Amino acid sequence: MENEEEIFKKLLKKASASSFEKIINLDLNNCSVDFNKYVLLLPKLINLKCLILSNNNTNQLPPFENLQSLEELYLRNFSVTPQQINKTSLSTDSDLTKSFITKIKTLTKLKHLVITGTKFDTNSSKDYIIHYLTTLETLNFERITNEKRQDVNNRIKLIREKHLINKSPTSAKILTTPNKTVVNRQQPQDLSTKKLVNTTSSIINISKSTPNKLQNQVQSSPKLSSPITKNKEQIVSTTSPQKLNNKVDFKLPPQIIDRNSPKHQPKIQSDVSSPLPIEIIPNIIEKTSDRLNGQSNLIQAISLLIGSITTLNDIDFIEDILYERKKILK
């Protein structure tokens, strides 16, 4: 079996050189016997410019990336047949081609390349070779023009853009859930939420009522004589101005009352304004909704009237209304 020194001598004899540094051109065409041994010595040929490896078969790709001075590479009918398929072997032609392009794209001085009759000789592979090797002048003895290089670069760009779009998270299909499944996953509606919705609806309905309608509801209620209702002296005594001021801070518009009539009976004009400004009714109801829950509409209305009193004139106005109502009920 030949030792390493004998392989060195054979390679130097083929190259007609006295040392590896002086080897500029190396022709290993159809060198099947010792080819794999010679390939192992290629990294030592740091000044090699022309390499011919045509008509050979090997079990691994030569270390082309180490030949940084290489200008010409001939691989006609060159084949690679891995001895075994494992995690590190080139199990497919696609893997083999990618590995080959990865190795030669680092050769920044390469000008001429021949790959006819190899697994690398495909349109896609040649496009990538032209794209990466910007110094390449001929490929398979065909000159590479600027127009051809530009066309190749455009094709590569489109391929990469398409690849990015396909890999984008936004391109994934969005799985939709049937409506009935969504309904089943919803949490049961809380009773307090339903109550809040009903309360809000009531507030909206009250805010839409006219001032006269609200006043008529208070005056025409059949429960005015409820035991809870106090006489006019009790209303005045139990309602402290200081306490009322803490609840509601607003002033009612002046009421039109004719004090010169007999018995000081008020004459309420048909277009008199409501004692409660319509814009503050929703706020009053919202503040007292929890306290008034479960009470009758009459009690709510009376409580709202009492809560709206801020001056003595307001009390006098309410007294007049109660007095008129009392006369009607008699």
Curated annotation (Swiss-Prot):
Residues 212-240 are annotated as: Disordered. Coiled coil: none annotated. Residues 214-240 have a biased composition (Polar residues). PROSITE patterns: LRR. It comes from the Eukaryota. InterPro entries: Leu-rich_rpt, LRR_dom_sf. This is Putative protein DDB_G0285185. The lineage of its organism: Eukaryota, Amoebozoa, Evosea, Eumycetozoa, Dictyostelia.
